[in-house]
Amino acid sequence: AWWEQKGGNGAILNLIGTGESNDAYICEIPPGKSLKPERHIYEEMIFVLQGSGATTVWVEGSKKQTFEWQEGSLFAPPLNTWHELHNGRSNEPARFLAVTCAPLAMNLYHNLDFIFNNPFVFSDRYQATSDYFSGSGKIHSGRIWETNFIADVYGLEPPERTERGRGNREFLFELVDNTMAAHISEFAVGRYKKAHRHGPGGHVIILS
C-alpha cells in the first residue's frame, strides 16, 4: 500500500515474539524515483531485496554523501541523520527490508515530533568522512566485522565457527556504532546450527 511518509509503497511487519523491542518493514521505491528524506531517533538497518540505487546521507551543516547499493547490500543510516533513498533503475522498482527499534522509541517518548523532527546531531555516530560508506572496517576476533556498508552479503565467505556446529560459518556485523547488530550464518549441506536461545527481536532472513 502507498506509504505517504515514505513516498513509496510499504508494509510494516510486527512479528509475534519481538516483544515490542523492534519491528521491520518492507518498502518499494518506484522506478526512477526517490523516497522522501527523513531522520529519526531510532536505529535502522536496511537489506536490499531487489534492484539497485543509492542513498544520500547528511546532517545539518555537513556536506551530503551518496553511496550506491545493489541487491544483497546491507547498511544502516547513522542515528538521526537525514537520509534519502533513490532507485537507480527507470524500469523496475527497488525493494528493501528494514529492521528498526522504532517501537522502543515510540513507547518511551510518546512524541512523534521529538522522534522525527529532532535537530540533535550524534557526532559520535557520524563524522561525514569521505570513506565512511566505503565498505572498509575492522575485523575483531576473526568474525566480528565493524563497518558501515556491506556491498553484497551473498558474496561473503564467513569464517568457520565449529562451536556452533560442524560446517558452520558465521560473520557478525556492527554497523555505524548501532546497538542493533546482525549476523550471517552458513551451514554445510545436511548440517544444522546447534540449538540456542536469546531475547526477543530476532528477524531471520533465508538467503538461499
Please tell me what each predicted stretch does.
Residues 1-20, 112-184:
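A short, N-terminal "cap"/entry segment at the start of jelly-roll beta-barrel domains
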Residues 2-7, 19-23, 27-33, 47-55, ...:
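The feature marks the first
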Residues 3, 14-17, 36-37, 73, ...:
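Beta-strand elements of modular eukaryotic interaction domains
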Residues 5-12, 23-40, 166-170, 181-198, ...:
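Conserved short histidine dyad/triad with adjacent acidic residue
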Residues 30-31, 67-89, 97-102, 189, ...:
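Conserved metal-binding segment of the jelly-roll/cupin
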Residues 34, 39-71, 81, 197-198, ...:
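A short beta-strand-loop-beta hairpin characteristic of the jelly-roll/cupin
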Residues 104-110:
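A short beta-to-alpha transition loop/helix N-cap that caps and shapes the active-site region
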